[in-house]
């Protein structure tokens, strides 16, 4: 990236669009040809690496500042609404990926999907308004009435971006997408820090969420090249809407796997413990975010484009899986050994209650990079019904196990422990098996790819824990460096001896040979 330019200066210049509406309605948004997928994926991954690094610096820096001005109790109040908002926006995810996957996509269909998305956004904002008093009663926090109404604006703005974002992903224009996301994060981070320093409490968290969606929606419309018009045949998108609703329904059911723990903690233990829970949950997700954000959008689009060529799809998936597991799994495992130091650096001394929760979450953090890749396969296959059945079973299991753990042990830590064991056990195994079945891939090559990586994770974590116990008298930051250094050396030594082939980013979007 040109160091003399800001991210928004790197966005592609827009060309003048035709005003011939008749021709415009007949135009299509074509997915890349098979022989272009590798080149576009590699180019997108290179840009994503640079901009992902920048976004993570912004995210961590913002978190470090805001967490020192906003208390765990106030973060917990914001989190009570954010969990509900996450539930509302799940339908938008279905509308996004159905556009990415559609083999033939005319502008009229996109317009129909956009119109439906706008209507949905209005209804979701209304739902946020109605839910405010209910959330306030459920959690015992009167502030949630107003907070829910304001956060509804972010939900509405997000619904406007589903089609512009989907069209960019469909065409593998990840450079533009990543720059848009980076600029939106930069501006929203400035808003959050300014509000936190001004001692606005939980409004700093809410303000960042709304500002992020506002900036992102404007930029996506500008740089996607999509200009919506009212559809003349709204029924033209009925097949896509049905598929999108199927994906959304699956997401809604899956929601309980991801957020039930937080809902229970907030309901029974209050805002302060929920704040610690959310911080630990966020750190648990970081290794997966670092490892997968670079390629997730690229891989869904690429695998969808290669869906008729099973051999190339399998080779591309294994290469991406190997890379993501190689980076994300050991990083997740090491969270067990370095939890006290990580929480201290990121959030400050007031967040010590998050440490034991993060230690438990390290178990889930090892599995998450792997299970995240299975989502690509489900999306690429288009087998919504299979994914829906799986999520119904797993969500039912989550409800039974988490409520059971709460009733038996009665602590927030027991809820986190149950969550982690579910993530690393039933969730992972069932997702891997069924996602491979959905696209017709064999499971055994995936298992062979993962076994040496998992063993290496255990070795590096054990060595780091040993260092921590032997040299516990050291200054905390020196001890952190010692743990990371020893754990890293052990893992890389193990990898060089047993992991073949070694993951290479430059091979990610290759032609499928030598997976």
What residues fall within each predicted segment?
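Membrane-proximal transmembrane or re-entrant/amphipathic helices at the cytosolic face
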Residues: 1-35, 432, 436-446, 450, ...
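Alpha-helical transmembrane segments of multi-pass membrane transport and lipid-handling proteins
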Residues: 2-18, 22-27, 115-140, 146, ...
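Interhelical loop/hinge segments that connect adjacent transmembrane helices in multipass membrane
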Residues: 11-37, 41, 175, 218-259, ...
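Transmembrane helical elements of multi-pass membrane transporters/channels
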Residues: 44-59, 205-212, 216, 220, ...
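Helix-loop junctions and terminal segments of transmembrane helices
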Residues: 89-107, 169-170, 280, 284-328, ...
């Amino acid at each position: 990236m040109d160091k003399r330019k800001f991210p928004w200066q790197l966005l592609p210049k827009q060309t003048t669009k035709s005003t011939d509406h008749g021709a415009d309605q007949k135009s299509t948004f074509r997915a890349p040809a098979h022989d272009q997928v590798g080149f576009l994926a590699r180019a997108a991954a290179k840009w994503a690496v640079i901009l992902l690094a920048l976004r993570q610096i912004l995210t961590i820096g913002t978190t470090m500042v805001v967490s020192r001005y906003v208390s765990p109790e106030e973060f917990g109040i914001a989190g009570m609404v954010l969990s509900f908002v996450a539930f509302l926006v799940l339908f938008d995810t279905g509308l996004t990926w159905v556009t990415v996957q559609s083999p033939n996509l005319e502008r009229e269909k996109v317009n129909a999907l956009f119109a439906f998305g706008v209507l949905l956004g209005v209804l979701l904002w209304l739902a946020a308004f109605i839910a405010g008093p209910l959330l306030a009663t459920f959690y015992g926090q009167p502030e949630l009435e107003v907070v829910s109404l304001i956060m509804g604006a972010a939900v509405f703005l997000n619904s406007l971006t589903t089609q512009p974002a989907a069209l960019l992903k469909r065409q593998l224009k990840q450079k533009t997408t990543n720059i848009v996301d980076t600029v939106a994060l930069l501006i929203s981070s400035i808003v959050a820090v300014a509000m936190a320093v001004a001692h606005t409490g939980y409004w700093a968290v809410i303000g960042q969420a709304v500002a992020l969606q506002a900036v992102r929606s404007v930029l996506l419309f500008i740089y996607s090249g999509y200009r919506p018009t009212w559809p003349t045949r709204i029924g033209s998108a009925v097949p896509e809407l049905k598929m999108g609703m199927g994906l959304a329904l699956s997401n809604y059911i899956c929601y309980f796997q991801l957020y039930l723990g937080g809902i229970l903690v907030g309901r029974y233990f209050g805002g302060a413990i929920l704040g610690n829970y959310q911080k630990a949950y966020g750190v648990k997700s970081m290794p997966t975010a670092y490892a997968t954000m670079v390629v997730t959008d690229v891989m869904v689009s690429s695998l969808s484009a290669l869906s008729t060529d099973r051999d190339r799809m399998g080779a591309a998936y294994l290469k991406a899986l190997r890379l993501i597991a190689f980076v994300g799994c050991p990083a997740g495992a090491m969270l067990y050994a370095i939890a006290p130091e990580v929480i201290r650096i990121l959030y400050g001394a007031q967040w010590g209650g998050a440490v034991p929760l993060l230690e438990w979450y390290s178990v889930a953090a090892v599995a998450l990079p792997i299970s995240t890749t299975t989502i690509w396969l489900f999306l690429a296959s288009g087998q919504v019904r299979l994914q829906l059945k799986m999520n119904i079973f797993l969500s039912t299991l989550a409800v039974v196990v988490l409520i059971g753990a709460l009733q038996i042990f009665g602590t927030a830590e027991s809820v986190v422990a149950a969550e982690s064991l579910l993530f690393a056990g039933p969730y992972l195994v069932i997702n891997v098996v069924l996602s491979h079945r959905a696209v017709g891939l064999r499971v055994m090559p995936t298992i062979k790819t993962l076994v040496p990586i998992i063993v290496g994770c255990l070795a590096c974590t054990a060595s780091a824990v040993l260092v921590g116990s032997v040299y516990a008298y050291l200054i905390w930051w020196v001890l952190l460096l010692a743990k990371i250094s020893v754990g890293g050396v052990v893992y890389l030594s193990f990898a060089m001896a047993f992991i073949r082939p070694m993951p290479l980013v430059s091979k990610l979007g290759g032609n499928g040979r030598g997976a």
